[in-house]
UniProtKB/Swiss-Prot annotation:
Official protein name in the record: Glutamyl-tRNA(Gln) amidotransferase subunit A
PROSITE patterns listed in its UniProt record: AMIDASES
Function of the protein: Allows the formation of correctly charged Gln-tRNA(Gln) through the transamidation of misacylated Glu-tRNA(Gln) in organisms which lack glutaminyl-tRNA synthetase. The reaction takes place in the presence of glutamine and ATP through an activated gamma-phospho-Glu-tRNA(Gln).
Organism of origin: Neisseria meningitidis serogroup B (strain ATCC BAA-335 / MC58)
Family statement drawn from the similarity comment of this UniProt entry: Belongs to the amidase family. GatA subfamily.
Subunit text: Heterotrimer of A, B and C subunits.
UniProt feature coiled coil, ranges: none
Catalytic activity: L-glutamyl-tRNA(Gln) + L-glutamine + ATP + H2O = L-glutaminyl-tRNA(Gln) + L-glutamate + ADP + phosphate + H(+)
Top-level EC class as recorded in UniProt: ligase
Protein keywords: ATP-binding, Ligase, Nucleotide-binding, Protein biosynthesis
Amino acid sequence: MTQYTLKQASVLLQSKQISAVELASAYLAAIAEKNPALNGYITIDQDKTLAEARAADERIAQGNASALTGVPVAYKDIFCQTGWRSACASKMLDNFISPYTATVVQNLLDEGMVTLGRTNMDEFAMGSTNENSFYGAAKNPWNLEHVPGGSSGGSAAVVAARLAPAALGSDTGGSIRQPASHCGITGIKPTYGTVSRFGMVAYASSFDQTGPMAQTAEDCAILLNAMAGFDPKDSTSLEREKEDYTRDLNQPLKGLKIGLPKEYFGEGNSADVLTALQNTIDLLKAQGAELIEVSLPQTKLSIPAYYVLASAEASTNLSRYDGVRYGHRAAQFADLEEMYGKTRAEGFGSEVKRRIMIGTYVLSHGYYDAYYLKAQKLRRLVADDFQTAFARCDLILAPTAPTAAPKIGADASPVETYLSDIYTIAVNLAGLPALTLPAGFSGGGLPVGVQLVGNYFAEAKILGAAHQIQLNSDWHGKRPE
């Protein structure tokens, strides 16, 4: 019962072939069996889950259900929900029970979706491996010795392991797409401002965006329909007409212009990644898509620009954690200043401290122009590159990550880890939508994904192209033993 896609589960629930309680119970049993090794979930509450499932069954019986009523979903530990712990995988918020619910979570609750739990992540969404979690690293279900990616690694792992039909993630510099690639699932980061950020713990406010993660592009489109929309509680939310993100699912690939950035297909990519790209190129050609070489020359500048800007925003956003109103507080201190210092030293992990220090430095007097202002100018150049490319093509095909998932504990420096996000970060700098879908496997049997990037508000086109690729391939249907 836990092998269904979101769409399949929806059909079975609406036709009353299964009940929401039966489906939720099956997932809870699978979680109890597999999660101790996987560590994909860090918070489970069976009573709350089954109560939501019973309410969903009542709604279905009364005939006022939506297509998502009774379908289970997992939430990254970054989303607040009344009565649930929302720790952001940090000691700092280990005991924080949220008094309110994030808008995107409320949207799915209004549809009647059933909460399975909170998934593991890199602390405060800072990381690419899920090793920066206070609760220990999540594992890759394809090989438990490898990382699932990050920062939404737990969400990717539980969907791949069939411990949830879908999950929510957040994407600041690739945190939905990179773990989706490493775990062999589909995940989309929408255009910045499409999905409300209210109730999602902030890391870098001008980058953060919520998106769905599931087995298929069709599942992601169905979820995004429920997630997206204007929210007056979020000052960065975009006021646009409601869209149907499933509208292009049946559009053929014939005639679609796909850009291939010449800078993305060279050195630095493993043979496995190049093979996955070629698999996708061959499929696109066979279906009649037109392939065009484009250039994104400023991509190499995206890493330094991102880590200056995101760290600066993080240092500001995380200044609220001081042990006064909520979160961890040091047990012993002589005065207020010592309480602040000890609380933050004890509550934050090493990667979070590193980024706070970088951010504080680049915003400090005398360095603002040299670092922060220059990085903002680079951000503009990266965005301009994409607009030049989209003048010639509809979508861009790119790698998601230069390699398959590395081993847990791999001896990589912070800079080497940052460089692994080279293909995802540019998209966040520009605020564009992008989706990762499975496209092959490494020699070691680990999934490898590729990325489809679109212009602003091209989510339906991206999802349609991805769905057509998945109708003509079976990478997305593979699952770990």
